[in-house]
Amino acid sequence: MANLHDHRITLTVSGPSVLACGAWLKNTICLTQNNQAYISPLVGDLSTIDARSRLDKTVQRMCREYSAQPAVVAHDLHPDFYSTQFAHAFAQQLNIPTLAVQHHHAHIAAVCAEHHLSQPVLGLALDGIGLGIDNTPWGGELLWVDGARFKRLGHLTTLALPGGDRAAQEPWRMAAAALARLNRGYEIVQRFANQPAAETVAVMLASNLNCPQTSSMGRLFDAAAGLLGISSIQTHEAQAAMQLQHLAEQYGPVHALTEGYQITENNNLDFSSLLSALIDCHDEKYDHAYAAALFHATVAAGLAAWVEKSAHQYEATHVVLSGGCFHNALLRHDLTHRLAEKSLPIHSPQQLPPDDSAIALGQAWIALHHNRL
């Protein structure tokens, strides 16, 4: 019987007990027993000592209450996460193996677990950032997922992260990255004159210094918000994206920008032309609400075309949507509607949120399938 505070999901796959240690943000723990998965309440963001202590105590409690002896410990691919370090220490103590699971693979797997999908699926994972198998920050991924295996079919065309993680807190930096990508880097200093680091960021982008490339959809939203002058600095996660969504909802439905996106020869989705259109909309004389609505509609249209193309190419019978960007109801509803018009069967998170709180379930599901290889 599940603890009253834990969430229980019955799986279609069974095996030795798995302990999954989740992600860095919105951490949860998942423990499996036979074909039952038990997901803990939210542990929280692992940057604090309190959250790390809660993780330790949560694992101890769950193993005790469910009389579980894990046979494997699953964790995120990122080596610096506390959850990863805990997983290795716990496994070493019990002399059991660990399994590193790619972040976006786990996002899609969590929905597969919830919807009892045992066949291969086409997965669209959209979020802030998760470490990819190529050691770069992913976040706008089209994946072919078959149990413990996955293949990256395509991704959003990358943008630079000037200053690395700092760019995730400062949307103006992502806007600067968009300007540089569109060969308008010479505008950065004047456009962001109120930012003391503007000149430094312009030099960084021009010289490609401390500017890792990311395929993140969350950072694309930040770039749009920064270009429109809606948000320059964020005080909490996804603040700029939520402001952009709120403006778009105020305006109402619009048609997507004609030729606002391109699917490249190597199956990447490029929104350069959309960003280019937004660059000249920052002035007060432009309707920012309309621009925000145009951004949402064009992103949804591009994603739908991208998914449809790959679904036909790979003969996908199921499409899975997951990742924190799907908290955005406007994007979620528009994309789901467009895909439904194409008669594509869509599966989205229902019992758990689309964000990183479901990562542990996905890790556990993958580990159970890995044991069957």
PLM features per residue range, with description:
Residues T12-T32, V121-V145:
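Gly/Thr-rich phosphate-binding beta-strand-loop-beta motif of the actin/hexokinase/Hsp70
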Residues D76, N95-A106, H318-S322, A329, ...:
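Conserved phosphate-binding/catalytic loops in two-lobed NTP-binding clefts
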Residues H104-L126, L131-G132, P171-A180, A289, ...:
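Glycine-rich phosphate-binding/hydrolytic loop that grips phosphoryl groups
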Residues M1-V18, A100-G123:
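Conserved phosphate-binding catalytic cores of ATP/NTP-utilizing and phosphoryl-transfer enzymes
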Residues A23-S53, K57-T58, A180-M204, N208-T317, ...:
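A contiguous, well-structured pocket-lining segment that forms one wall/lid of small-molecule binding clefts
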Residues M1-P70, H78-F90:
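Active-site-adjacent structural elements in enzyme catalytic cores
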Residues R152-D165, L205-L209, L344-Q350:
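Short beta-alpha connecting loops at secondary-structure transitions
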